[in-house]
């Protein structure tokens, strides 16, 4: 690769340069685990090396300008390949990237390199990024979440239990005033948060400024009546970064505690800009993962959500939707809890049974609160409390607004169910075994909860799991 060797034109096998089984990864390398499905006749070593090359310094032919740089210093290296158990012709290729390949503090640049061109590569039938190890040296170039779990609890003055939320439905079509009314009723009934749906931005039936004003009124009215701090996730997502920041500025001027962003459709550059604004101005930031299933649903191609979750923790967000394990949206228990730990904890050990391919130290990057949302109702409360623990937001949209008596009773039912589960857990009871009994007993003292129990006693969303190891 040095100029003195002389330049020899032509196409050579990637594995001669980029497959290095003897390489010991450095502490400051970014490590990636790819699930590779090569085309028939392509050896796994060549496929793994091709991934390393095309996502770092390589191109399809030898170029004479290779002689002007130290390829050994900058190239990605495929350092290990292992077959995937139970799958024919699938391999996990481990690739190490030198840190100098990436711009500091830019998730955008990291993804452009690692998953940019290589996913359209002809030698591969399919390719999936299963996990990334982000070294502390790179992590420290990111601000991360605007505030993190502990600061959020201090701002809200809420401790020792999960937080309760509700997405306002119907998601599209309400006028701003009716929307604000639904927000008020839910918050007044006992919820901590209400939420704009991900596709509520600024449409003809409800412009963003009107919605912000009516929701702020609902927040302050419910706060003064309950003595609790309340919030509504005001969706600041917009067509341009400038417009998004303008909406966040208006939210700050109204004095509300939290705004929201759709981080995948909005993009990582916009998300990181908003996260910086939120930290500088005391706003919490709720993140919705709209579009994630386009990227992470296929088992053999795309990017696993645990990578998107890590990227969000780096880019910045205080809450992110993370599946439910029990509702209508997909999420397998061990795998979901794997990326929930990656969002919340300071240090996560490698654990292949939960899909965690690398030990991940987060140094002092604040944590993100996972949000369980999608098809959940009061009967799920014991399971959700046990699975997600205190540092979570449990979000019941239809499970609040679908209550036969209205929005406020729906909120009250959820709050009573949650308080009953937390109390039972603190007394040492087994929520998994005794959950239904705990809810039934609580419903004797809460007519709202009793009505909710009756409505949703038969509802189940049971389909085969897609996300298996």
Curated annotation (Swiss-Prot):
Localization in the cell: Plastid, Chloroplast
UniProt-annotated site: Transition state stabilizer, residues: 328
Gene Ontology molecular function, alphabetical: magnesium ion binding; monooxygenase activity; ribulose-bisphosphate carboxylase activity
Binding site for Mg(2+): 195, 197-198
Pfam families: RuBisCO_large (PF00016), RuBisCO_large_N (PF02788)
Modified residues (N6-carboxylysine): 195
Modification comment: The disulfide bond which can form in the large chain dimeric partners within the hexadecamer appears to be associated with oxidative stress and protein turnover.
Keywords attached to this entry: Calvin cycle, Carbon dioxide fixation, Chloroplast, Disulfide bond, Lyase, Magnesium, Metal-binding, Methylation, Monooxygenase, Oxidoreductase, Photorespiration, Photosynthesis, Plastid
Modification sites for N6,N6,N6-trimethyllysine: 8
Catalytic activity from the UniProt record: 2 (2R)-3-phosphoglycerate + 2 H(+) = D-ribulose 1,5-bisphosphate + CO2 + H2O; D-ribulose 1,5-bisphosphate + O2 = 2-phosphoglycolate + (2R)-3-phosphoglycerate + 2 H(+)
Co-factor binding details: Binds 1 Mg(2+) ion per subunit.
Enzyme Commission numbers on file: 4.1.1.39
Protein residues bound to substrate: 117, 167, 171, 289, 321, 373
Needed co-factor(s): Mg(2+)
PANTHER family: RIBULOSE BISPHOSPHATE CARBOXYLASE (PTHR42704), RIBULOSE BISPHOSPHATE CARBOXYLASE LARGE CHAIN (PTHR42704:SF16)
Record's subunit section: Heterohexadecamer of 8 large chains and 8 small chains; disulfide-linked. The disulfide link is formed within the large subunit homodimers.
Family the UniProt entry places it in: Belongs to the RuBisCO large chain family. Type I subfamily.
Miscellaneous comment: The basic functional RuBisCO is composed of a large chain homodimer in a 'head-to-tail' conformation. In form I RuBisCO this homodimer is arranged in a barrel-like tetramer with the small subunits forming a tetrameric 'cap' on each end of the 'barrel'.
Protein name: Ribulose bisphosphate carboxylase large chain
Naturally occurring in which organism (per UniProt): Persicaria senticosa
Source lineage: Eukaryota, Viridiplantae, Streptophyta, Embryophyta, Tracheophyta
Gene: rbcL
């Amino acid at each position: 690769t040095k100029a003195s060797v002389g330049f020899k034109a032509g196409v050579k096998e990637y594995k001669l340069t980029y497959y290095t089984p003897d390489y010991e990864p450095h502490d400051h390398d970014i490590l990636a685990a790819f699930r590779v499905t090569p085309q028939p006749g392509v050896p796994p070593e060549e496929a793994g090396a091709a991934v390393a090359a095309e996502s770092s310094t390589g191109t399809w032919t030898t170029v004479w300008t290779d002689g002007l740089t130290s390829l050994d210093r900058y190239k990605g290296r495929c350092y290990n390949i292992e077959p995937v158990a139970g799958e024919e012709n699938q391999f996990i290729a481990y690739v190490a990237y030198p840190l100098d390949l990436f711009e500091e503090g830019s998730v955008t640049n990291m993804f452009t390199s690692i998953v940019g061109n290589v996913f359209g590569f002809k030698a591969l039938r399919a390719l999936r990024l299963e996990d990334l190890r982000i070294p502390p040296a790179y992590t420290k170039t990111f601000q991360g979440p605007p505030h993190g779990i502990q600061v959020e609890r201090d701002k809200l003055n809420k401790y020792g239990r999960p937080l309760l939320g509700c997405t306002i439905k119907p998601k599209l079509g309400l006028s701003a005033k009716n929307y604000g009314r639904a927000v008020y009723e839910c918050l007044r009934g006992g919820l901590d948060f209400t939420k704009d749906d991900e596709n509520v931005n600024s449409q003809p039936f409800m412009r963003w400024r009107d919605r912000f004003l009516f929701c702020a009124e609902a927040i302050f009215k419910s706060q003064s009546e309950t003595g609790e701090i309340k919030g509504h996730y005001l969706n600041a997502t917009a067509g341009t970064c400038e417009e998004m920041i303008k909406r966040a500025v208006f939210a700050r001027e109204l004095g509300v505690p939290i705004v929201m962003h759709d981080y995948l459709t909005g993009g990582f550059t916009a998300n990181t800009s908003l996260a910086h604004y939120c930290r500088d101005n005391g706003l919490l930031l709720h993140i919705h993962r709209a579009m994630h299933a386009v990227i992470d649903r296929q088992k053999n191609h795309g990017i696993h959500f645990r990578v998107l979750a890590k990227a969000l923790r780096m880019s910045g967000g205080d809450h992110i939707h993370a599946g439910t394990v029990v509702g209508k949206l997909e999420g397998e228990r061990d795998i979901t809890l794997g990326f929930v730990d990656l969002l919340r904890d300071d240090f996560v050990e490698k654990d292949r049974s939960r899909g965690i391919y690398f030990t991940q130290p987060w140094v002092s990057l604040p944590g993100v609160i996972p949000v369980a949302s999608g098809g959940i109702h009061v009967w799920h409360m014991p399971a959700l409390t046990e699975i997600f623990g205190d540092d979570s937001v449990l979000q019941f949209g239809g499970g609040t607004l679908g209550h036969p008596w209205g929005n406020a009773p729906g909120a009250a039912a959820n709050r009573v169910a949650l308080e009953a589960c937390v109390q039972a857990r603190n007394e040492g009871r087994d929520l998994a075994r005794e959950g239904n009994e705990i809810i039934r007993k609580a419903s004797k003292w809460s007519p709202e909860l009793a009505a909710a129990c009756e409505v949703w006693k038969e509802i189940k969303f049971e389909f085969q799991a897609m996300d298996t190891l």
